[in-house]
């Protein structure tokens, strides 16, 4: 859910509304019951006129419940309003998705230019104060810790030894390193030995009669 909203529990279905009410009118009417997130009026797809039905999405379910109790079967502009918690039809996520209207030259309500829907002459309850624009926070140049971790992981992958192409090679490589460390610290009776001597395997004859040879450390 977007921002923690639960539209299946916080959306009010309102019917028998006056056809002349606009989105802004309904916003002002229902805002007294709580924070209104979105207002959707059902309109005829051909005439674009209201069907007298709307969905009011509140920020929390308590506000939605208070709204239904307050206005259900109550008169509004001469009509008896029906209100209830909307039944989720599986399109809740789509309903709460914010829509951006990039064409600011025309009013969303009436389609005429020169004003926006907040100041549309068709608003029965007058103009509504437009919401304040959110100030964009400047991003800090310092990378976030998560990004730093990702960069470290990438650099490690790039620096891998090409000899470690398989599991067996990796085991052999690690074993060779261990033996090299052991040979460095092993006391020698015949004087100091070079690193090349310590790493070179010694060959000795087998104890039993054979032409085979076996390796010793």
UniProtKB/Swiss-Prot annotation:
Annotated spans, Disordered: 120-217
Domain RRM: 10-88
Biased composition range(s): Acidic residues: 145-163
GO molecular function: RNA binding; zinc ion binding
InterPro entries to which the protein is assigned, alphabetical: Nucleotide-bd_a/b_plait_sf, RBD_domain_sf, RRM_dom, RRM_dom_euk, ZCRB1, ZCRB1_RRM, Znf_CCHC, Znf_CCHC_sf
Gene Ontology cellular component terms for the protein in this record: nucleoplasm; U12-type spliceosomal complex
Flavoprotein keyword on record: no
Zinc-finger in keyword set: yes
Zn finger region (CCHC-type): 105-122
Residue list for modification Phosphoserine: 155, 210, 216
Domain of life: Eukaryota
Location of this chain's protein in the cell: Nucleus, Nucleoplasm
Quaternary structure annotation from Swiss-Prot or TrEMBL: Component of the U11/U12 snRNPs that are part of the U12-type spliceosome. Interacts with ZRSR1.
Name of this protein: Zinc finger CCHC-type and RNA-binding motif-containing protein 1
Lineage of the species this protein comes from: Eukaryota, Metazoa, Chordata, Craniata, Vertebrata
């Amino acid at each position: 859910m977007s921002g923690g909203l639960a539209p299946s529990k916080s959306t009010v279905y309102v019917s028998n509304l006056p056809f002349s009410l606009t989105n802004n009118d309904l916003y002002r009417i229902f805002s007294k019951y709580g924070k209104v997130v979105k207002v959707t009026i059902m309109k005829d797809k051909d005439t674009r006129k209201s069907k007298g039905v709307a969905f009011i999405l509140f920020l929390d379910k308590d506000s939605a419940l208070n709204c239904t109790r307050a206005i259900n079967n109550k008169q509004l502009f001469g009509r008896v309003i029906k209100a209830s918690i909307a039944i989720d039809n599986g399109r809740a996520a789509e309903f709460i998705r914010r829509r951006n209207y990039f064409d600011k030259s025309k009013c969303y309500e009436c389609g005429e230019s020169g004003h926006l829907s907040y100041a549309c002459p068709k608003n029965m309850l007058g103009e509504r104060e437009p919401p304040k624009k959110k100030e964009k926070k400047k991003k800090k140049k310092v990378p976030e810790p998560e990004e730093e971790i990702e960069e470290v992981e990438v650099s490690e992958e790039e620096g891998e030894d090409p000899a470690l192409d398989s599991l067996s090679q990796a085991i052999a490589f690690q074993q060779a390193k261990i033996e090299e460390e052991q040979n460095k610290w092993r006391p020698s009776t015949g004087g100091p030995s070079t690193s090349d001597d310590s790493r070179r395997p010694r060959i000795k004859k087998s104890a039993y009669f054979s032409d085979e040879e076996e390796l010793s450390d």
